[in-house]
Amino acid sequence: MEENYKLSHLRELEAESIHIIREVAAEFENPVMLYSIGKDSSVMVRLAEKAFYPGKVPFPLMHIDSKWKFREMIEFRDQYAKEHGWNLIVESNMEAFNAGVGPFTHGSKVHTDLMKTQALLHGLDKYRFDAAFGGARRDEEKSRAKERIFSFRDRFHQWDPKNQRPELWDIYNAKIHKGESIRVFPLSNWTELDIWQYIRLENIPIVPLYFAKERPVVNIDGNLIMADDDRLPEEYRDRIEMKKVRFRTLGCWPLTGAVESDADTIEKIVEEMMTTTKSERTTRVIDFDQDASMEQKKREGYF
């Protein structure tokens, strides 16, 4: 009797990602998985757990905490790491934070550079990681669309889009010199819809902010910003209104816009994704604070 070994498209994506994760574990001395607490990170963490099951994942998680994340994100992070036995490293730029750096006072560009990019680079140098997994996907944004799965970084952690290595089929070049590193994107070929379908298939826990509910938001420059704590400037507080919203992407709460939605279950989110025509990155303020914003940030060492 002939067996049918044809995989569904989700299982094909899963197999590719697991292969990439295992390849990194085999090729590099000290890898780390960057954990943003979002839906893509949650899928990536599940794939890592499956890649080495029933053994322990041979690398830690590292979260770059800007001190402006949604409170529900931090609660979810701590609970998930504890329940699943992950070695969780949390890095923050406390010098900048104690100096009062924030998105409202310094703007998105300065805040992102000091609280996210510089904190990330410090963490990578501190622990001497030579490979860092990220949850970026090519369908998210144009600069990410042209980046390799194994993305080379020089000894300053900088990315040069004109100096990328060829990737033929599933052959990856892990050769680096001392001080250089590789950013690895095992979800490169996934779409936002794939992510949600896989979350449904695997019953992966995610931050409740992804589900629609009544939340206090204020319209700031066309973005529905949730009033997550008392650091919202006084000038915006009298404009707060309750709307049924959810988040398609998560980051620092003053820089992440919500979308009006009734999708309060995974099934409804999947249905919503079937008809959407805009990337989730359109709600991220940091992607539009300068021309070619994301590419420039990546050149400087951003995720």
Curated annotation (Swiss-Prot):
Pfam families: PAPS_reduct. It catalyses: sulfate + ATP + H(+) = adenosine 5'-phosphosulfate + diphosphate. One of its GO terms (molecular function) is ATP binding. It is an enzyme of class 2 (transferase). SUPFAM superfamilies: Adenine nucleotide alpha hydrolases-like (SSF52402). Its EC number is 2.7.7.4. One of its GO terms (biological process) is sulfate assimilation. Keywords: ATP-binding, Nucleotide-binding, Nucleotidyltransferase, Transferase. The keyword Cytoplasm does not apply. Pathway: Sulfur metabolism; hydrogen sulfide biosynthesis; sulfite from sulfate: step 1/3. With CysN forms the ATP sulfurylase (ATPS) that catalyzes the adenylation of sulfate producing adenosine 5'-phosphosulfate (APS) and diphosphate, the first enzymatic step in sulfur assimilation pathway. APS synthesis involves the formation of a high-energy phosphoric-sulfuric acid anhydride bond driven by GTP hydrolysis by CysN coupled to ATP hydrolysis by CysD. Belongs to the PAPS reductase family. CysD subfamily. PANTHER family: SULFATE ADENYLYLTRANSFERASE SUBUNIT 2. Heterodimer composed of CysD, the smaller subunit, and CysN. This is Sulfate adenylyltransferase subunit 2. The lineage of its organism: Bacteria, Pseudomonadati, Bacteroidota, Bacteroidia, Bacteroidales.
